A protein has these predicted regions:
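VWA/integrin I-like adhesion module and closely mimicked acidic/polar interface patches used
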Residues: 382-428, 433, 440-446, 503-505, ...
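Von Willebrand factor
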Residues: 170, 269, 277-334, 340-375, 411-417, ...
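C-terminal helix of von Willebrand factor
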Residues: 418, 423-468, 475, 482
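N-terminal, polar/Ser/Thr-rich
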Residues: 4-6, 18-47
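Short beta-strand-loop
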Residues: 320-347, 364, 368, 387-394, ...
């Protein structure tokens, strides 16, 4: 029987001439960028999502009035929800309006000599903030908040505060701006962790611990880190959940009485996905374009070499390099013998970086010469922004849909083309994740292999009956992999008992799993869910446009409408920061003010209460389960086993775990040194 299981692992690396988040001024303006007096971040991780609040002080060190500009990379799936500017005794609060209206109001106030602020989203690349008419020696404090879902992968949760610029802008844009990324005072990140499940360890490679309080057995920690290198490096925080936690279904609701509700549903399968033991093929597709210079191509080559050296005797591999075109440097598949590995490492040492990036040609070449009788994994290392050859997302979607493949997409660096990667993965039933330049490349490759070497759940479909739900995202996915959570957002009418059903195929066998739960009539603990639901909707419709399933003009109207309704910054909406009097003058409704008040009230209440467990597939414990508690037994097979964890599993996972743990420290240290 032919086995057509082709897997692509794509590592998208953005590495050249790395810049940092910071203040900007035009190079030829004669003005220096605003001085960063302090930069303080508070991250609250609670029940599957993170709230990030950034407070930064700017000072105009010029002798004339200036427009202060600050930019930072767009975090993955982030909903920028609030921004406040304080200049002396004057406070300006943000309201989301259509982008053209925000620009008009901002320019009007700026030209009148008044203070005003505006926050914009520039595609997938960055958020930018402008403050008009900052007087000489004046200090402004800007505070903004964003929310994002934070899924767990194989028992490990990862949070990233992006600071490094990804260098995806053109050279002219980079040369236009002078940048300041060094605070004169301290830069700190405070992480408040509130997990409903026991935690065994936390780690932040880039931060120096300034203060720490932790009760990991009960899932809580409060740690402040100092960023000693300023705003030049991403801040990455990891925490590991306890081993032997159960597979589970968690549903976090939000519903005002008399209105439709919103929910975030997180499925952590406890299904026993067995290891694949047959010999496999691996194709490494390495970007050697000019953006991979500065020692990065050599670092990645070493990572690939380490991966090859851990292969089984019956595995084969193939190496392709590409810039404006592709070259098969191994001349096809070769067995993973010691001699062949040594030859391949020597070839990789000779690769130099130059030229442009043709991602489409790299993928096209990678899909050639596939053996239907063997599991094939394609590991693609690229700088993320294709600038030569085919660049239309529809063409990528069409090519991927013609092949029965799996794409594992890992985007390293910030300002990466998340929409294109989502399209490639959604069409092919793949998996994608972020890798910071201050993260671990080798560890990510190893973690991907734990998914590649295990069975997957195919054609996953989730349905909810008993309560009317609508606008549900991710309820149908082609594949779900070992250790991967399925995170869905949706809306519901009324309230009451419901049955959640998941249908899937595992090794050709049809499986059906069910779970009963209750949607509440009223639950106002998590109003932030509405903003994250809106971002999930935008991403879903963006993918439909990229696949040719929705018209771009129709999508533009949709994005503008949902951005205004839920008060989030999008490509079609902006935050305009004005005083109360200015808002009234421009007839701007205070919709965001109401949302922010509700969110802050809920956040204050949550701080005084024990961490709430939202598990619905079993009686909810009143406190986090001890780390050594066995998984509860259910008649429902989805929850018969423990959830996969990085520290246990079948097949070759134990070997790969050792490599991951060793690599996480070594690679992070090397990046910092470079």
């Amino acid at each position: 029987m032919n086995i057509k299981r082709t897997i692509i692992t794509m590592f998208t690396i953005v590495t050249t001439i790395l810049q940092a988040a910071g203040t900007l001024s035009p190079v030829n303006s004669g003005l220096k960028p605003a001085e960063i007096v302090s930069h303080d971040v508070v991250v609250t991780i609670n029940n599957g999502f993170a709230q990030t609040e950034v407070s930064q002080q700017f000072k105009n060190i010029n002798d004339t009035t200036m427009e202060a500009i600050y930019s930072f990379p767009v975090p993955q799936s982030a909903s920028l929800a609030d921004c406040q500017v304080q200049i002396g005794e004057q406070t300006m609060n943000g309201e989301v309006v259509a982008k053209d209206k925000a620009k008009q109001v901002y320019e009007e106030e700026k030209n009148a000599g008044n203070n005003a602020g505006v926050a914009d989203k520039n595609g997938y690349q960055d958020f930018s903030f402008k403050i008009a008419n900052l007087a000489p020696q004046d200090t402004a404090t800007i505070t903004f908040t964003y929310y994002q879902p934070l899924p767990v992968d194989t028992g490990v949760c990862r949070y990233q505060y992006p600071l490094e610029e990804g260098n995806t802008d053109d050279a002219g844009a980079m040369g236009f701006w002078e940048r300041n990324d060094k605070p004169t005072g301290k830069a700190t990140v405070r992480v408040i962790l509130r997990s409903a499940w026991p935690v065994t360890a936390v780690r932040a490679p880039q931060g120096t611990v300034a203060s720490e309080q932790a009760d990991l057995a009960n899932g809580t920690a409060d740690i402040t880190y100092e960023l000693t290198e300023g705003l030049t490096k991403d801040f990455v925080f990891y925490y590991s959940l306890a081993n032997n936690l159960p597979g589970r279904l968690e549903v976090v609701p939000f519903k005002r009485n008399g209105e439709d509700g919103t929910f975030m549903m997180v499925l952590t399968p406890g299904i026993d996905l067995k290891p694949i033991t047959n010999g496999a093929d691996y194709v490494f597709v390495l970007d050697k374009s000019g953006s991979m210079c500065g020692g990065k191509i050599q670092t990645l080559a070493k990572g690939v070499a380490k991966t090859i050296q851990k292969m089984n005797a019956n595995d084969r591999f193939r190496i392709i390099t590409f810039n404006h075109n592709a070259e098969d440097i191994t001349g096809g598949y070769i067995p993973a013998t010691s001699e062949n590995i040594q030859k391949a490492v020597a070839m990789l040492d000779g690769v130099t970086a130059n030229g442009s990036t043709n991602l489409y040609d790299g993928l096209k070449t990678a899909l050639m010469k596939l053996d239907d009788d063997r599991v094939t994994s394609l590991v693609i290392v690229t700088d993320g922004v294709t600038n030569t050859g085919e660049v239309n997302p529809k063409a990528f979607a069409k090519m991927m849909s013609r092949n029965d493949i799996r794409v594992f997409g890992f985007l390293m660096g910030n300002s990466c083309n998340w929409p294109l990667m989502r399209t490639i993965c959604d069409v092919s039933g793949g998996f994608y994740d972020a890798v910071s330049n201050d993260d671990d490349i080798i560890g990510k490759i190893m973690l991907a292999k734990s998914k590649i070497t295990s069975e997957a759940m195919h054609d996953v479909k989730v349905s909810i009956n008993g309560v009317k739900t609508y606008d549900v995202t991710k309820d149908c996915v082609k594949k779900l992999y070992r250790g991967q959570q399925l995170v869905m957002f949706g809306r519901y009418k009324d309230h009451g008992d419901a049955t959640v059903t998941m249908k899937t195929r595992i090794s050709g066998d049809d499986k059906t799993y069910t779970c009963k739960m209750t949607f509440p009539e009223q639950d106002e603990d998590n109003p932030e869910l509405e903003r994250m639901f809106a971002i999930a909707q935008i991403e879903m419709h963006e993918d439909m446009v990229n696949q040719g399933l929705e018209d771009q003009a129709e999508n533009t109207d949709f994005v503008r409408g949902i951005g205004l309704k839920y008060q989030i910054v999008t490509d079609e909406t902006s935050l305009i920061m004005l005083t109360d009097e200015q808002h009234a003058k421009h007839n701007i409704e205070r919709n965001n003010q109401k949302r922010v008040q509700a969110e802050r009230t809920a956040q204050a209440q949550r701080k005084t209460q024990p961490v709430k467990n939202y598990r619905v597939d079993a009686p909810r414990p009143t406190s986090p389960m001890p780390a050594n508690s066995p998984a509860p037994q259910h008649s429902n097979g989805m929850f018969q086993y423990h959830a996969p964890h990085i520290s246990h599993g079948g097949g070759a996972m134990d070997v790969w775990t050792v490599v991951i743990i060793a690599a996480m420290g070594a690679v992070a240290a090397r990046y910092r040194k470079e």
